[in-house]
A protein has these predicted regions:
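Hydrophobic alpha-helical segments
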Residues: 12-13, 82, 177, 334
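Bacterial N-terminal signal peptides
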Residues: 12-23
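N-terminal low-complexity/intrinsically disordered extensions
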Residues: 14, 31-33, 352
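N-terminal catalytic scaffold of extracellular/periplasmic and nuclease hydrolases
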Residues: 28-305, 313
């Protein structure tokens, strides 16, 4: 039966739950929306009545008030930050929400994470085209290019098989960061993994094999065919701020420098004798290269040139192990990256993994 009763529909929460509230007065308040009354387990006559949760009235009414306060976006953002948590599916997010709530002395499920307070949210399906269990190379490519692709490849389309160097030259995909640079935005990539690892590499690299982080992992046929390793592609990319780990992919095997950040000897792994740090610095006299937290803290945010910070031979240390190192935290790197980008341009794009 068609009803003439007013109905208000709105989305609320990270899970995009659709609520349709019928017949509520336009001036509904937090205390008047729903009165507490017994709720039956089923429609049977012997159903056990349960008291409605005391917070239901406030929760539903507050959600309605928040939804009514929303307004269309009438301006264009000057900058954007893309936060990616590796493996950050609904189960991980739910666990994080519960833990955060329990740390505040509540049961946990009723809590909200920071981004769940944003006015809009959506789900994005980034599955691989050739297998059900996705990997971060193909999924990050989907995020940054808008094209789903095969597992294990970066910045190339699904018509290319993993490891196919020749085929990869025919199917490059433009990334969001390349488009941003072309449009005049300043760009940055921050990660506590190797900067050549799959997710950050998807911002700038085009390769049929995520493991080709340096030329050491590349087969001879791929080298002869002209494919470039990921570290070399970073040197060629025009990114203004780069912070992460993975120094070993940029240095020759003859380089045995000791990093100030602990983590052992910063032995290079390249077999072509190239020092990519020097190659990157040689592109402009204004560029800066740093390897520890002290240098990051002392870095002038108004520095003109690009900044490259590689703080460990491989991944940065986990938080509970970082006390004995001079490595910056993800927060340290992100804060400084934002300051640097803001000093370079009003319009900028940053990836944080």
């Amino acid at each position: 039966m068609k009803s003439n009763t007013p109905k208000t529909c709105f989305t609320y929460g990270f899970a995009a739950l659709l609520l349709c509230v019928t017949g509520l007065p336009a001036t509904v308040g937090a205390d008047s929306a729903i009165k507490e009354k017994p709720v039956a387990r089923s429609g049977r006559s012997n159903a056990v009545p349960l008291p409605a949760p005391r917070e239901v009235a406030g929760t539903y009414a507050k959600a309605l008030e928040d939804a009514r306060a929303l307004r269309p976006i009438d301006h264009q953002a000057d900058s954007a930050i893309i936060f990616i948590g590796d493996g950050m599916g609904m189960s991980t997010v739910t666990a994080a929400r519960i833990l955060a709530g329990q740390r505040e002395g509540r049961s946990g499920e009723e809590g909200m994470l920071a981004w769940e307070h944003l006015p809009s949210s959506a789900f994005v399906k980034t599955f691989n085209t050739n297998q059900q269990v996705a990997d971060s190379a193909g999924t990050a490519t989907a995020i940054f290019t808008g094209h789903r692709t095969n597992s294990g490849v970066l910045g190339i389309g699904p018509s290319v098989s993993r490891g196919d160097c020749e085929g990869s030259k025919r199917a490059p995909l433009a990334s969001l960061f390349e488009l941003a640079t072309g449009a005049g935005l300043a760009t940055g990539v921050v990660t506590d993994t190797r900067i050549t690892h799959a997710t950050p590499a998807a911002a700038y690299a085009h390769t049929p094999e995520r493991d080709w982080e340096s030329n050491l992992e590349m087969p001879e046929a791929a080298r002869e065919a002209g494919c470039k390793d990921i570290a070399t592609q970073l040197v060629d990319a025009n990114i203004d701020v780069v912070f992460g780990g993975g120094l070993r992919a940029f240095l020759p095997q003859t380089d045995f420098r000791q990093l100030a950040s602990g983590g052992g000897s910063g032995v290079g792994e390249r077999t072509d004798g190239r020092n990519l740090v020097q190659a990157w610095l040689a592109q402009s006299p204004d560029r800066r290269f740093i390897t520890d937290k002290d240098a990051l803290d002392k870095l002038d945010p108004s520095v003109d040139g690009a900044v490259l910070g590689l703080f460990a031979p491989s991944h940065l240390a986990y938080r509970y192990k970082r006390a004995n190192t001079d490595q910056p935290s993800l927060t340290d790197m992100t804060t400084r990256a934002i300051e640097l980008l803001q000093s370079k341009s009003k319009r900028w794009l940053l990836l944080v993994e």
